[in-house]
Regions:
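Short, glycine-rich nucleotide/cofactor-binding loops
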Residues: 1-14, 31-39
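Histidine-anchored nucleotide/phosphate-binding helix
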Residues: 10-24
């Protein structure tokens, strides 16, 4: 399953809810959720711990638009829009967390 999250972990608990509820799969962080994939943020440890159960990707254009490309956590895969399409096509179901 592909889990899509678009809210910053500082303003919304969608990512934490996903990590606490879902059994595994792919996570794609888009829009303001890309802040969760940066070194030094409050949820960095939680995200790193989840890497055993989830493959975590971040939408590179959103990361770059926020000037955060150089702060990406090791183990998180940046993807372009084509990669977003591939993740969607490779998963039978997609869940957007609000």
């Amino acid at each position: 399953m592909l889990h899509i999250i678009n809210r910053s972990p500082q303003s919304n608990n969608a990512l934490e809810n996903c990590l606490n509820t879902a059994a595994g799969g792919d996570i794609l962080l888009i829009e303001d959720a890309v802040y969760a994939a940066t070194a030094g943020n409050a949820i960095e440890g939680t995200l790193r711990a989840a890497m055993g159960r989830f493959k975590i990707s971040v939408l590179r254009p959103d990361l770059e638009a926020r000037g955060l490309a150089d702060r990406l956590i090791e183990g998180v895969s940046p993807v372009d829009y084509g990669g977003f399409v591939d993740l969607t096509a490779n998963n039978k179901t997609c869940q957007s967390w609000l």
